[in-house]
Amino acid sequence: MEIKDQGAQMEPLLPTRNDEEAVVDRGGTRSILKTHFEKEDLEGHRTLFIGVHVPLGGRKSHRRHRHRGHKHRKRDRERDSGLEDGRESPSFDTPSQRVQFILGTEDDDEEHIPHDLFTELDEICWREGEDAEWRETARWLKFEEDVEDGGERWSKPYVATLSLHSLFELRSCILNGTVLLDMHANTLEEIADMVLDQQVSSGQLNEDVRHRVHEALMKQHHHQNQKKLTNRIPIVRSFADIGKKQSEPNSMDKNAGQVVSPQSAPACVENKNDVSRENSTVDFSKGLGGQQKGHTSPCGMKQRHEKGPPHQQEREVDLHFMKKIPPGAEASNILVGELEFLDRTVVAFVRLSPAVLLQGLAEVPIPTRFLFILLGPLGKGQQYHEIGRSIATLMTDEVFHDVAYKAKDRNDLVSGIDEFLDQVTVLPPGEWDPSIRIEPPKNVPSQEKRKIPAVPNGTAAHGEAEPHGGHSGPELQRTGRIFGGLILDIKRKAPYFWSDFRDAFSLQCLASFLFLYCACMSPVITFGGLLGEATEGRISAIESLFGASMTGIAYSLFGGQPLTILGSTGPVLVFEKILFKFCKEYGLSYLSLRASIGLWTATLCIILVATDASSLVCYITRFTEEAFASLICIIFIYEALEKLFELSEAYPINMHNDLELLTQYSCNCVEPHNPSNGTLKEWRESNISASDIIWENLTVSECKSLHGEYVGRACGHDHPYVPDVLFWSVILFFSTVTLSATLKQFKTSRYFPTKVRSIVSDFAVFLTILCMVLIDYAIGIPSPKLQVPSVFKPTRDDRGWFVTPLGPNPWWTVIAAIIPALLCTILIFMDQQITAVIINRKEHKLKKGCGYHLDLLMVAVMLGVCSIMGLPWFVAATVLSITHVNSLKLESECSAPGEQPKFLGIREQRVTGLMIFILMGSSVFMTSILKFIPMPVLYGVFLYMGASSLKGIQFFDRIKLFWMPAKHQPDFIYLRHVPLRKVHLFTIIQMSCLGLLWIIKVSRAAIVFPMMVLALVFVRKLMDLLFTKRELSWLDDLMPESKKKKLEDAEKEEEQSMLAMEDEGTVQLPLEGHYRDDPSVINISDEMSKTALWRNLLITADNSKDKESSFPSKSSPS
């Protein structure tokens, strides 16, 4: 029988819908196992056609047609025509061209818009003395999962490996079997009737066995998650199962342990001719042992026998698996099996329109869109199983999945299979064991190239133009108006202001806030302490806390990028030391001159905002970003270790002790033998007489304050030896680093449910600090603790909270202050904007935009306020900001088993930064709690933050390549396009710049550090002489050029022309002139027909047809 004749006979069997409203999920009545689902249980799984994706890579959105009246007329014309679907595709040279044409078409309704698919493979099974049933043996959401041989558990998800023979057989099934597209049916019984009627009318099925096949299709379906009512709660449950129940969403908690009742299952509108499945009288043969080796029959799996009439049985929904199914997903059911009364295969591929919820058919209660039925004679169970796996795997393929939705006839489906065969990779049988399960990859390659037509040689593919500057968005365009960039920043950020507070209602934000509060407190207090030593207490810890709190609150509320965390920086401390030394030498008021410099710096920064100077950020490329960020991370690690080593001075260890003399160990305070002149002067001023002091009774701190000396075997040079404290501090330090890293990676571990792992990972650092504090308190060793000021007042009594810019200084100092203010302006600008550039990287997928001008304005204003109040200056802190961003990463909650969660972006909000600095300002009143936090724990947090911030920096990946043989090097994209020697040269230059920055940072010349960071931009420009433009495009961002605007305008015009063609419904394919004349293009369909394997399959199909022609039939094919 010809395929065209077969298609002509299908047309009368395709009823058309008369309603023109939105498609409603009507459910079905064929199932005896009715299921009642609570509304909140299935929320998100019953709503269809709300958010859909369009498979064509070049199109961004789907055009919705408002003129629905045309559908009736179009369908009437299609029904009157003799075509199978009323739509014909032109002929093409290759299957890829046909598939690209299919995916490029648009339909007038939403029935052909692809949805996510859940595919289930059921095989018919029977046991002696029991009724037959369909048993679930495998399922696909993204990767394949099989029911293990014992029948009690699912296998781990794995990449399906298919035999080429089964793919050829599947192609033959689609080519010769029954294909019914856009069938309108409401129950499984109606579907079976239409399929079998078509089979009988086309001569593929004998009328005598039609009824028995129908009864086989109506048999009960048993799914892996079904359990008996009496055994729903086993006596012994694993902790993982208990945790799983606790980790379900609140909307599902109350129903998670309940079995749904059958009273309110969705009823079908047409409930007619209901034939009960349990009364079926199909006599299956006992000879199903003809299964081939290598495939375990579903009947061989351990079964849970469910006794009693079906109306007493109730289904349990696997809510944990339901969470992994995307909203709007549809089902694809594969039914395969052996029947003793058949002597040839029965094959049908059905696409329902609309999708219908068929009760009991699928494991999860979602509408069914596709059915594939393959029933055949005994002895070929393994063959049918592999064909079922093949079609199921094809349905999970991104391209064939879209073809199945948009196919107009069987030829489209065959083209989809051929295109799939054109892309598959074949493994040699002698070098690979097919029984080995391949682990799912971490990153699945994109399939967009398969959907978009190829282009002739010499032309650039659309969307693959060479990249330009990495920071060339609209927020960095010069406006040419005073404060033009600032106005645009405000307009860009204002619509998101309230959402910045709403989006913070998440446990992740709470975890981020608690972690970063502890991380920000210590450097602020430490910086204040160092500043107090450098300025003789004029600016100390309490001023640092107050300034950080006030500046941070204002910035978090009104800044352009609230993800940035403000903090103190090393160059600012160096500047403060130099300024104080200068004022002391020349008898000037330090706070007054500092206020003048701060006001000039704020004014200059505001001028930079007014002139859109932040647009210069586009010259800061990855080369400069990574050198700066790497330096800050290394400094964090270095200072954490340095602070740990400094503890050995305060808590020395006796390295030469004698265990035999421990009983004689003592350390006493005695009067100094030769007191210095300074000591004698201090005693006279305090009216202290050395002879009146009982030196032996003094404590360590009292002895130190009176300049006494320590005598005894247990004494060091300046202090008594302190047992255990240093070693205990080292233990706390490294335990904090290790536990923080371990708990942060807990999200990817194998233990506990997903929700538990996610919470532990989010609160990793806070839980670590809490654990270390409790352990330290329980052990009782007097480790150094965090010291927080307990009184809110200036450190010195001779200063207040406000400072006049002039004060006792000469009037000309106010004008002269502009000179150091210029240097401070460069320092503030570079620190702020480089950190902002790192936070606003495209890979962070920020959706609310950035505000470089608004950020700089807020920093400038608060710098002026802090100057008048005599408080430290604060600017963007690189490592704290990167840590803040990393703690707020969003990943997809709905991911298929075996699929890695997708990075969705950052939870952009203002609340975490706001709460950090509010609590920081309140720390004065929390001294009784904060005094229990050991300083080594905070040093360990610093080391963890510095090390974790290094992840993702390409510079360190390239450093590793120096000691790595080429065959072991990772598959970095730049290694594919840039010679290795050029990669090494680029890295060496970057390392040299980093080394120079480090030398300047730790030396007395640290004041010029911002100038050296600025010099990196010029170094990067000179690298254009050593590298080609193409090489730099892979290793670094290209520098902005004068031609960039013209190139962007040309790209915009090209995009507009492409959109215009799409609106006209035109899809241009290079069908002539390229493919036909290119001898390298192979048509896999033609080549397949020449293979001996395909010819053998055709001979088998022809013999079956000849045999079928001898069957008596009530209706012959036309």
Swiss-Prot record:
Mutating P965L has which effect? In NEDHBA; likely pathogenic; affects function in cellular pH regulation; retained intracellularly with loss of localization to cell membrane
Classification via Pfam families: Band_3_cyto, HCO3_cotransp
InterPro entries per record: Band3_cytoplasmic_dom, HCO3_transpt-like_TM_dom, HCO3_transpt_euk, Na/HCO3_transpt, PTrfase/Anion_transptr
| Any one cellular-component term (Gene Ontology) | perikaryon
Q: Composition bias, kind Polar residues: at what positions?
A: 248-264
Q: Cite the effect that the entry attributes to Y721C.
A: In NEDHBA; likely pathogenic; affects function in cellular pH regulation; no effect on localization to cell membrane
Q: Does the keyword Ion transport apply?
A: yes
The record's account of tissue expression is: Predominantly expressed in the brain.
Outcome recorded upon mutating R538C? In NEDHBA; uncertain significance
Membrane topology, record value: Multi-pass membrane protein
Listed GO molecular functions?
A: sodium,bicarbonate:chloride antiporter activity; sodium:bicarbonate symporter activity; solute:inorganic anion antiporter activity
* Residues the record marks as carrying a glycan: N674, N677, N687, N697
Keyword terms of this UniProt record = Antiport, Autism spectrum disorder, Cell membrane, Cell projection, Disease variant, Glycoprotein, Intellectual disability, Ion transport, Membrane, Phosphoprotein, Sodium, Sodium transport, Symport, Synapse, Transmembrane, Transmembrane helix, Transport
The Gene Ontology biological process terms listed for this entry are: bicarbonate transport; brain morphogenesis; chloride transport; locomotory exploration behavior; multicellular organism growth; post-embryonic development; proton transmembrane transport; pyramidal neuron development
Subcellular location(s) of the protein:
Basolateral cell membrane; Apical cell membrane; Cell projection, Dendrite; Cell projection, Axon
The stretches that face the Cytoplasmic side, renumbered to this chain, are 1-509, 560-562, 618-626, 742-762, 831-855, 934-935, 1020-1118
User: What is the stated purpose of this protein?
Assistant: Sodium/bicarbonate cotransporter which plays an important role in regulating intracellular pH. Has been shown to act as a sodium/bicarbonate cotransporter in exchange for intracellular chloride. Has also been shown to act as a sodium/biocarbonate cotransporter which does not couple net influx of bicarbonate to net efflux of chloride, with the observed chloride efflux being due to chloride self-exchange. Controls neuronal pH and may contribute to the secretion of cerebrospinal fluid.
- From the record heading the sequence, give the disease linked to this protein: Neurodevelopmental disorder with hypotonia and characteristic brain abnormalities: An autosomal recessive disorder characterized by hypotonia in infancy, delayed psychomotor development and intellectual impairment. Affected individuals commonly display traits associated with autistic spectrum disorder including anxiety, hyperactivity and stereotyped movements. Episodes of seizures in the first few years of life may occur. Brain imaging shows abnormalities of the lateral ventricles.
Q: What is known of its domains?
A: The N-terminal cytoplasmic domain is likely to have a high level of intrinsic disorder.
> What family is reported?
Belongs to the anion exchanger (TC 2.A.31) family.
NCBIfam families tied to this protein: ae
Specify the protein name: Sodium-driven chloride bicarbonate exchanger
In the UniProt record, the gene name given for this protein reads SLC4A10
